[in-house]
Amino acid sequence: MSTSTARFRHQANRRTRRGRRLTVRTVITGITLATALACAERPHAQGVPGFLGTITDSQAVFSVPALPRPAYLTPVTEPTFGTRITRITGDAGSIISPTLGMWGNDARQVYSKQQPWNSTGTLLSVENRAGDASASPLILDGETYQPKYTPCSAFDNYEYRWHPSPDYPNVQIAVSRAGTELMWFDVANCRKLRTWTLPFPANYGIGSGEGNVSDDGRYAVISDGTRMVVVDMDPRGSAPAYPFKRIGPVYTFAPCSLQTGDAMFCPNGNISISPSGRYIDLKFGSGGVSCDTLCDMHRIFEVDSLLAIRPHRMADNSLRCGSFASRPDGWVFPLKHADMALDPFDNNEDVLLGGRACPGSSLGRVVKVRLRDGKVTALTDPSNEASYSHGSARNTQRPGWFYVTYAKASGSAGRRFSGEIVAVKLDGSGTVQRFGHYRSTAGSYRAQAHAVPSPDGRRVLFASDWAEGCGSDCGSPSVFSGYVIDARTGRDTIPPDTVQDLRKK
């Protein structure tokens, strides 16, 4: 069967399979004006323009009411926050379709820093692994979540990102398994559009698994354990256009003295070009040694017009941590599970966003660092705040917000945001938008939520085993599924039940 024929049959199967688009039951006639007004008057139910549900009260503490595990592709209302939740991956061992194989035990998004939706929100990529899984990743319809197709056989998609520009909605940017080729690949038409031979093998794809390309899809940084290089994938201005291959000089990591007695102890945890393409964030790994500040240390490099790389000097008085306090040669305040964004409240400066990781610091759990000079801004109030787990700034079409997955471990019980997915505003005001509880044990890595927003920030995809806060209908701690919280307006929904604020009076 030809690729085009197979793709057509996949489309035909999608149209006939389950025979419907998802709808949400209309219940307007059952809601009285008094009920609607009561919902509007509740402090926690204050709305955000353009959003359905979500809670803006940053001080409220909520328990997790029981919510049975949603059936596949059947939306339910989040009982506390009023958003909609849909499980978008099927039951383990069930048939996806006659041509697409079976669902595995581990079907979810990749990670909080990797965007699962394409630039237009019309396609969505999920992993499908373990158990009876047939193929991974799977491409779903980005709106209905119906499976569309499996990977093209010619696509060496070892490590990939969707192209962030709406001009390339079908294109993924990928590094081959061998780490020797960077490519643009049209996953809808199974066609390689652009290719670059890398000057050295990348040790693990784009940014050691956690990097992204610049917001316009032009720049990428590729690395191994000791080197990095910038690729201009879409040359403009005075540079010749593609297929001219514009690759910068290879930069070798300088001694960094992360470990006393070993100046070359500089393990590469992950690396990424900044949204503007002007900076590189190199996050160092612990290398298995005892952690203090070095476990979450970041060093910022600058990229010049010739794509040459050098450490970027920070302001001498910018806040740093521990023995790095007096080292402004690229070092910044340590952050865990950090992502980068352009800050609309600061002239679109590149900023690093993540969890506070300086021992003894009294800042809020969520912190912003400006890459130009290392300026530190706390974005949340630390009082009774749950621990930070992961964060995502993949909402590139809704700038000004950072989506945080808060921990639900025993140390966070009874705290604000415990077990929640929360958007935090970048202006330092402490403004939040609370989307929902993720109802997972988070007992293993793949059971962690790793919430990631859609490009427009109105939907959030998270992973869960749905084995806590589930009442009598729970999932299994060994089965991991993908769930979408949908906060878009324009669809009828049932308002959430009245919930109790458990904050300490």
Predicted regions: what is each one?
Residues 53-95:
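Blade/loop signatures of beta-propeller domains
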Residues 94-110, 201-207, 253-266, 324-326, ...:
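Short glycine-/Asp-/Thr-/Trp-enriched loop segments that recur within the blades
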Residues 348-440:
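Loop/turn-rich, solvent-exposed surfaces of beta-rich toroidal or solenoidal domains
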Residues 446-493:
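Blade-level signature of beta-propeller repeat domains, shared across WD40, Kelch, NHL, RCC1
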Residues 237-382:
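Acidic, serine/threonine- and glycine-rich low-complexity intrinsically disordered segments
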Residues 151-228, 235, 241-260:
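Asp-box/WD-like beta-propeller blade repeats and closely related beta-sheet repeat scaffolds
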Residues 132-139, 179-185, 226-232, 288-302, ...:
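Structural motif
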Residues 107-109, 114-123, 154-176, 205-219, ...:
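Blade-terminus and WD-like Trp-Asp/Gly-His loop motifs, strongest in beta-propeller folds
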